Amino acid sequence: MKAITSAPFTLALGKCLFCRECALRAPKNIRFTNDYRIGSASREALVIKPGDEKVEFHPELVRPEIPKLFGQALKLRQVSAAGDASVEMELNASGNVNFDFGRYGVEFVASPRHADGVVITGPISKNMAEALDICYHSIPEPKLVIVCGSEACSGGLFSESKAVNREFLNKYKVDLWLPGTPTHPMTFIDGVMNMLSLKKR
């Protein structure tokens, strides 16, 4: 997994583990901030180039039916596709008394039959590929897909593992990319609110 390229110089947040080792080694070239607004409707927008000050969300890439249909209430089914539970714990925290994302009508549900979309965490192992596919097809149309965490965005540390099967992401459109190891609750909340047009960026 290579999050950094040298020619041209870029940093791919979808592959980044946020260990900050690169910033320690090259403090004049790389600087991490506390800005949690790093989600995007475009995978390409997660690639940071020299001079970039923030990650662009690109609302024009959001399917127009998403804010129209899910702006008042959004029910999500979370699938841990071989994740390490770090992103899953942060997603759980998004509904606690500190963040209270449920006040906007966004909640996690136990069954894909009751969901409007799926939130994928983990690198998507071969053992979870079929289960994820079944979950996706169990969600009624129209539906959306959110990938959450660097493992889900790129495979993370396991991107070159033979135990990973990421064909799902080639078959279905991803509506929201949320990097992070793990993804902060505010990153998740901000990304979903932008996707649903619940706030002005």
Regions found by a protein language model. Give the residues of each.
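Iron-sulfur cluster-binding cysteine motifs and their immediate structural context
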Residues: M1-A41, L46
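Ferredoxin-type iron-sulfur electron-transfer modules in oxidoreductases and energy-metabolism complexes
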Residues: T5-T10, S138-E141, V145, A163-V164, ...
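Short acidic/polar capping segments at secondary-structure boundaries
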Residues: K15, D35-G39, A81-A82, E151, ...
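Short low-complexity, flexible loop/linker segments enriched in glycine and/or proline
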Residues: L46-V47, S161
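N-terminal, charge-rich interaction modules
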Residues: P50-V97
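Short gly/ser/thr-rich secondary-structure transition/capping motifs
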Residues: F99-Y104
